[in-house]
């Protein structure tokens, strides 16, 4: 079972995440941030990852802490589920269109967290959601899962379309990278023979 479970409790939020990499795309997300719930559903549905996420946070102030802490917990649960990363493809990439928007995501389950973020979102908000929080979510996921993550916007003018295309591309790239490669026969996909949460490969 490639699963992860995290309970993150701070003075600002209380977040619980359960994640199953070998799921069927079932998602129950209740974070108090409706647009974030919608995007978490995209990760689950298109990545075929089962997600159960609940969060209670100081959203009466703004969504920043909840958004970031959900990203942290998702990243930690993903790292748990990957374990020593034996047998996975390791690399994944996808280009997702959504109407006029086109977003490319490439990632490496390297154990070396890094993000290169290239979205240009034309509005400050989508509904009540601050669009600057998109980057903060992915930074939190990458830093806590050990992903090297590159996000590029190739086209798009509608903020919702751009962000949703990004989450869909991330989901499909993650699915590609984390699926088991039968030709590896359980070997770690690194010439050094090890992939760790922090450290060079």
UniProtKB/Swiss-Prot annotation:
One of its GO terms (molecular function) is imidazoleglycerol-phosphate dehydratase activity. It catalyses: D-erythro-1-(imidazol-4-yl)glycerol 3-phosphate = 3-(imidazol-4-yl)-2-oxopropyl phosphate + H2O. GO terms for biological process: L-histidine biosynthetic process. It is found in: Cytoplasm. Keywords: Amino-acid biosynthesis, Cytoplasm, Histidine biosynthesis, Lyase. Pfam families: IGPD. Its main location: cytoplasm. Its EC number is 4.2.1.19. PROSITE patterns: IGP_DEHYDRATASE_1, IGP_DEHYDRATASE_2. Pathway: Amino-acid biosynthesis; L-histidine biosynthesis; L-histidine from 5-phospho-alpha-D-ribose 1-diphosphate: step 6/9. It comes from the Bacteria. Belongs to the imidazoleglycerol-phosphate dehydratase family. This is Imidazoleglycerol-phosphate dehydratase. It comes from Synechococcus sp. (strain CC9902). The gene is hisB.
């Amino acid at each position: 079972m490639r699963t992860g479970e995290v309970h993150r409790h701070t003075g600002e939020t209380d977040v619980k995440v359960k994640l199953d990499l070998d799921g069927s795309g079932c998602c129950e997300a209740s974070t108090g941030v409706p647009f974030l719930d919608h995007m978490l559903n995209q990760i689950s549905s298109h990545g075929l990852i089962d997600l159960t996420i609940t969060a209670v946070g100081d959203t009466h102030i703004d969504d920043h802490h909840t958004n970031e802490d959900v990203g942290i917990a998702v990243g930690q649960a993903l790292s748990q589920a990957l374990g020593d990363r034996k047998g996975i493809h390791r690399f994944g990439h996808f280009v997702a269109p959504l109407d006029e928007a086109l977003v490319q995501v490439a990632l490496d389950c390297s154990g070396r967290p890094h993000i290169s973020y290239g979205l240009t979102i034309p509005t400050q908000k989508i509904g009540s959601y601050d669009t600057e929080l998109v980057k903060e979510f992915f930074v939190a996921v990458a830093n806590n899962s050990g992903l090297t993550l590159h996000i590029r916007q190739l086209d798009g003018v509608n903020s919702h379309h751009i962000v949703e295309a990004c989450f869909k591309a991330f989901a499909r790239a993650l699915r590609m990278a984390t699926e088991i490669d039968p030709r590896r026969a359980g070997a770690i996909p690194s010439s050094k023979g090890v992939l760790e949460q922090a450290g060079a490969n």
